[in-house]
Curated annotation (Swiss-Prot):
The gene is nuoN. It is a multi-pass membrane protein. It holds the Pfam family Proton_antipo_M. NCBIfam families: NDH_I_N. This is NADH-quinone oxidoreductase subunit N. It catalyses: a quinone + NADH + 5 H(+)(in) = a quinol + NAD(+) + 4 H(+)(out). GO terms for biological process: ATP synthesis coupled electron transport. Its EC number is 7.1.1.-. Disulfide bonds: none annotated. GO terms for molecular function: NADH dehydrogenase (ubiquinone) activity; NADH:ubiquinone reductase (non-electrogenic) activity; quinone binding. InterPro entries: NADH-Q_OxRdtase_suN/2, ND/Mrp_TM. Keywords: Cell inner membrane, Cell membrane, Membrane, NAD, Quinone, Translocase, Transmembrane, Transmembrane helix, Transport, Ubiquinone.
């Protein structure tokens, strides 16, 4: 046996097969780098990106779950595979609608596509992280990529302002999380979630661990855009290209919630109940502030930005109920938010392409007469975000509500109901403007086929999952049970 073979056999070769989706996306990103320099064809670059994402999504089904690779730094369990699949599909729907939007703005930067893919890789690393080091690497890869995407409208001061605020607040979150990780490592001597869990319980929490947990919660809340760390959200969402806003509001948020759940269940399972009150306060503040400020918005895109802060509160409320039901509700709400969020923002993107459309609330006057189908789809998304049956948004809020009641957190359950009622003020306002007012313009509204397909697809699934939620709820319950049991490690 050669010296090289001896070294390899001694060290061990990581199982690269379990990261096949990540490899496909990485190769696609590097191909785009070369193609963008040589060809600069929008159609070719978009087609390559879509092909890579489809192949990556298909490869998820080829992976054997339960594998741990890279010396315990990367886990591929059912939880990570499901979230990876939905993150890839979310990115796919964003990408297919990016080209028509950029064409309408006469703005084209090929780097949009491969930076989105780098951000996606970071999110996929996040959801597969059983270790604070890999979690941090994935978090920063996705965050830095999104900083760039948020400021790609270089001549728009709103884009630059939003990106700058996001960069500053994101940098603060990075510093806070870094310090929290350092404190945890100093106390336990390990970055591994399960090792940390074996060394820390409710009987041996000292000042160092308490401080680390406070900092970790603050850092993660900042990344999730929870109140009072949400200040960057409306400006960053409003200034970014609307398909990118959809990516930021949905994919980045979902990946963050997946990480929060994995960290709390795997690294701190014995003290999650003691810290549930902190999550409950963040949830209540996000619901109250997000919904109240959304009431005052005249720009619908900015309104949906504050709405996303409120939805962060609904999801955090599920974390505040640290039970199997609560974790299932978190996973379920995270997955269904994809359909509501992508549908709503892509619909705005489609409308924004039209001449003199600024996403101001007055632009929606008479939309039902100018485009009956788009008005119907918008109504479905607004009803779902509000939580009106038979939409899936109702089932999501019902799951969180029942989890809170089961954990005797009545005050937060009441807050959820009251704030959902308050949110009717701005969700139904859009519906009233669409159906009860005369159009401000008679100009024809044009939409790309990909936009119509995406919006229709999301609207249909919002209704189907609202009427038949058992499949998604079953997936959520299974993932929650497996995560709590620690299966896959």
């Amino acid at each position: 046996m050669s010296i090289l073979q001896q070294l390899v056999s001694g060290i061990g070769v990581p199982n690269f097969g379990v990261i096949l989706p990540e490899i496909i996306i990485l190769i696609t990103a590097f191909i785009l780098l070369v193609v963008e320099l040589l060809i600069r064809s929008r159609v070719v670059i978009s087609a390559i990106t879509v092909t890579g994402l489809i192949l990556a999504a298909a490869s998820v089904f080829l992976i054997k779950k339960g594998d741990v690779t890279f010396y315990g730094l990367y886990v591929v369990d059912m939880f990570s595979l499901i979230f990876k699949l939905f993150l890839i599909l979310t990115t796919l729907f964003v990408v297919i609608n990016l080209k028509p939007y950029l064409d309408s703005k006469k703005s084209y930067y090929g780097e949009y596509y491969y930076i989105i893919l780098f951000a996606l890789i970071g999110m996929m690393i996040m959801v597969s992280s059983p270790n604070l080091v890999t979690f941090y690497i994935g978090l920063e890869l996705s965050a830095v990529s999104i900083y760039i995407l948020a400021g790609t409208f270089r001549k728009d001061y709103r884009s630059k302002e939003g990106a700058f605020k996001y960069l500053i607040m994101g940098g603060m979150g990075t510093a806070i999380i870094s310090y929290a990780i350092a404190l945890i490592y100093g106390r336990t001597g390990s970055f591994d979630f399960y090792t940390i869990a074996s060394l820390i319980n409710s009987n041996n929490i000292d000042v160092g661990i308490s401080g680390a947990l406070i900092l970790l919660i603050i850092g993660l809340a900042l990344k999730a855009a929870a109140v009072p760390f949400h200040f960057w959200t409306p400006d960053a969402y409003e200034g970014a290209p609307t398909p990118i806003t959809a990516f930021m509001a949905v994919a980045a948020k979902i990946a963050t919630f997946a990480v929060i759940l994995r960290v709390m269940v795997e690294a701190f399972p014995f003290i999650s109940k003691e810290w549930s009150f902190a999550w409950a306060i963040l949830a209540a503040a996000s619901m109250i502030i997000g919904n109240i400020i959304a009431l005052r918005q005249e720009n619908v895109k900015r309104m949906l930005a504050y709405s996303s802060v409120a939805h962060t509160g609904y999801i955090l409320a599920a974390i505040a109920a640290p039970t199997g039901m609560g974790f299932s509700a978190l996973i379920f709400y995270s997955l269904i938010y994809i359909f509501m969020g992508i549908g709503g923002f892509i619909l705005l993107s489609a409308l924004e392409k039209n001449h003199n459309w600024s996403n101001h609330i007055d632009d929606f006057k008479g939309l039902a007469k100018r485009s009956p189908m788009m008005a119907l789809f918008m109504l479905i998304f607004m009803f779902s975000m509000l939580g009106i049956p038979p939409t899936v948004g109702f089932m999501g809020k019902l799951g969180v509500f029942l989890a809170l009641i089961g954990s005797d957190i009545w005050w937060l359950a009441v807050t959820l109901v009251v704030m959902s009622i308050v949110s009717a003020g701005y969700y139904l306002r859009v519906v009233i403007y669409m159906y009860m007012y005369e159009p401000v313009s008679k100009a024809r509204l044009n939409f790309a086929m990909t936009e119509m397909f995406t919006v229709a697809f999301m609207a249909v699934f919002v209704l189907i999952l609202g009427i038949y939620p058992t499949v998604f709820w079953g997936i959520s319950t299974t993932l929650s049970s497996l995560l709590i049991a620690g299966i896959g490690r």
